[in-house]
């Protein structure tokens, strides 16, 4: 496992400490037997004191090794889990939207949290309880055989029977644990839908339906968990039964051999301790090994994320590196050149043969009916997807030749659903500019008509709940716009970012934006015609195709689709 390679030194030290612990544990029963057989029975006080000192040293080795081994193994497991979690998170940031959708949000949360916690516990328990078993079993049987060959052979047979039972149980448990993880994914998905969509569920009186759906998912998980518990109960019962049988067998065989003067009575105690020690560790190892199939499934799921190749690959060019494409618009910040796009699982193009440019100092608007592909244009500019045909250029360079970091560093984006992160207003604004001063933030808030923040007692330090749920929809949109303005980008994209604003605030905001973005290109994606009336050019989309391109007055005369949208809104009071 590549994540353990970074901790080779810690692994070696941990195993060495555990070895010291096990050696100390194994020495004590033999020393005790020798003390009784040789020292006490003969009254040799010097031997008793000397052997007692050796036992004290061995006990100190075992105790110190156990404490230090627990600490080191816990630290190792936590570090490895942290590295895996960071790697999964970093990989998720590299994935394109289509790559991310292969797993789903619920599954990615499970893989990043629950699965890696399972892996961490498996590493910890394997180091502490499984790895010592082979050494303890072999060494314990050898110690018992050195005391008495017949007793050592008996102990070896008992251990072999227990190991066979463990292998059989683990083989049956593996597929059940695999199913358990898929059920956890389903529970996460259904629970997340119910929590996020609780208002919709209540609005449609679907509480009973959702309760039944949740009950079905929970029941599937519970049924499989019960099967696992049955295996654990069976393993526990059989192991304790075998331990008791082994204890009786050792006492019976040992008693007969003592009666036959083939061994001394204290040796029975030593062999019995070895038997119980080995069988206890074997039993604990069985419990851990039963969970290893689940850990293996979790590791495989994390590996699936780490091994997926992102469909969006960074280019090596930088803006200003070499001449732009011939025939391109020299004034364009962003340009679509006969660009078509189709989703991987689609039969038809979502966008077909788009050609237009967003020029510096101008506002370009995109309008169209729902499903016409307006928001997809924004996602393509941000390179969440790559064009299927044609090209999209940023400052004359094809996006596919640029890195995603460089592209997004030049673009400020306000998404269709304004999302704010938990923290404060200031921390959200600094997403756009980490080095922003208080004056910068106040200016952005003023342009975005978000001065309501200053009316709050804490001002810029006003708390923001996850998703910005402690603000209204219009306030969230204005704060998201202020965050974008902090970036001082070459291209501003507003994806239906004025929909929750009243007409007065909308007009004031657009007027302030004209001055603030005079040196940049602006792309506004909108439903309301009133929002884009004064755009320098308006792109009209229908079913993914450009059916109109021009200013408002021109389109009212030449574009039937645009005229129909405008007239329908005017009749509706807009």
Can you annotate each of these PLM segments?
Residues 42-43, 78, 86-110, 114-116, ...:
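Short intracellular "coupling" helices and adjacent cytoplasmic loop segments at the cytosolic face
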Residues 5, 11-68, 72, 145-150, ...:
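Transmembrane helix-loop-helix hairpins at lipid-water interfaces of multipass membrane proteins
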Residues 322-574:
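ABC-type nucleotide-binding domain
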Residues 6-9, 97-98, 114-123, 127, ...:
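An intracellular "coupling" helix at the cytosolic face of ABC transporter transmembrane type-1 domains
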Residues 44-48, 139, 143-160, 164, ...:
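Helix-loop-helix
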Residues 1-6, 108:
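A short amphipathic helical element positioned immediately N-terminal to and/or at the very start
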Residues 20-24, 56, 60-77, 158-172, ...:
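Hydrophobic alpha-helical membrane-associated segments
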């Amino acid at each position: 496992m590549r994540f353990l390679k970074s901790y080779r030194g810690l692994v070696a030290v941990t195993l060495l400490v555990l070895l010291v612990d096990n050696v100390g544990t194994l020495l004590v029963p033999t020393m005790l037997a020798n003390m009784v057989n040789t020292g006490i029975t003969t009254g040799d006080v010097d031997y008793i004191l000397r052997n007692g000192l050796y036992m004290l040293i061995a006990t100190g080795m075992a105790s110190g090794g156990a404490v230090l081994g627990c600490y080191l193994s816990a630290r190792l497991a936590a570090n490895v889990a942290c590295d895996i979690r960071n790697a999964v998170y970093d990989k998720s940031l590299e994935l394109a939207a289509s790559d991310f959708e292969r797993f789903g949000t619920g599954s990615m949360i499970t893989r990043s949290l629950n699965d890696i916690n399972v892996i961490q516990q498996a590493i910890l328990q394997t180091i502490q309880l499984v790895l010592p078993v082979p050494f303890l079993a072999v060494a314990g049987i050898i110690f018992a055989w050195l005391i008495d060959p017949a007793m050592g052979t008996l102990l070896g047979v008992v251990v072999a029977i227990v190991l066979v039972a463990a292998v059989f149980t683990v083989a049956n448990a593996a597929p059940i644990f695999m199913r358990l993880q898929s059920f956890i994914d389903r529970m996460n998905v259904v629970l997340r839908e119910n929590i996020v969509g609780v208002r919709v569920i209540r609005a449609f009186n679907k509480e009973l339906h959702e309760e039944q759906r949740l009950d079905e998912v929970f029941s599937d998980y519970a049924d499989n968990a019960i099967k696992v518990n049955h295996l654990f109960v069976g393993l526990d019962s059989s192991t304790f039964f075998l331990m008791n049988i082994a204890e009786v067998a050792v006492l019976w065989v040992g008693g007969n051999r003592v009666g036959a003067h083939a061994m001394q009575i204290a040796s029975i105690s030593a062999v019995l301790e070895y038997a119980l020690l080995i069988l206890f560790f074997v039993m604990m190892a069985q419990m851990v090994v039963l969970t290893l199939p689940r850990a293996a499934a979790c590791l495989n799921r994390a590996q699936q994320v780490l091994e997926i190749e992102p469909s969006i690959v960074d280019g090596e060019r930088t803006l200003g590196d070499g001449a732009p494409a011939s025939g391109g618009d020299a004034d364009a910040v962003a340009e679509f050149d006969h660009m078509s796009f189709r989703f991987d699982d689609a039969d038809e193009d979502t966008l077909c043969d788009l050609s237009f440019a967003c020029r510096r100092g101008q506002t370009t608007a995109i309008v169209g009916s729902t499903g016409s592909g307006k928001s997809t244009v924004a996602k393509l500019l941000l390179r969440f997807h790559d064009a299927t045909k044609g090209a999209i250029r940023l400052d004359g360079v094809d996006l596919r030749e640029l890195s995603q970091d460089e592209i997004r560093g030049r673009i400020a984006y306000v998404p269709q659903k304004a999302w704010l992160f938990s923290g404060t207003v200031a921390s959200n604004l600094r997403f756009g500019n980490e080095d922003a001063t208080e004056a910068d933030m106040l200016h952005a808030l003023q342009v975005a008509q978000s001065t309501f923040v200053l009316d709050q007692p804490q001002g810029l330090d006003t708390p923001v709940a996850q998703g910005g749920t402690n603000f209204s929809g219009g306030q969230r949109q204005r704060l998201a716009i202020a965050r974008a303005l902090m970036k001082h980008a070459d291209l501003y994209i507003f994806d239906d970012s004025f929909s929750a604003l009243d007409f007065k605030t909308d007009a004031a905001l657009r007027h302030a934006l004209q001055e603030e973005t005079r040196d940049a290109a602006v792309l506004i994606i909108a439903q309301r015609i009133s929002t884009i009336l004064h755009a320098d050019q308006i792109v009209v989309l229908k079913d993914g195709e450009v059916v109109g391109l021009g200013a408002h007055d021109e389109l009212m005369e030449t574009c039937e689709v645009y005229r129909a949208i405008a007239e329908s809104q005017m009749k509706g009071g807009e």
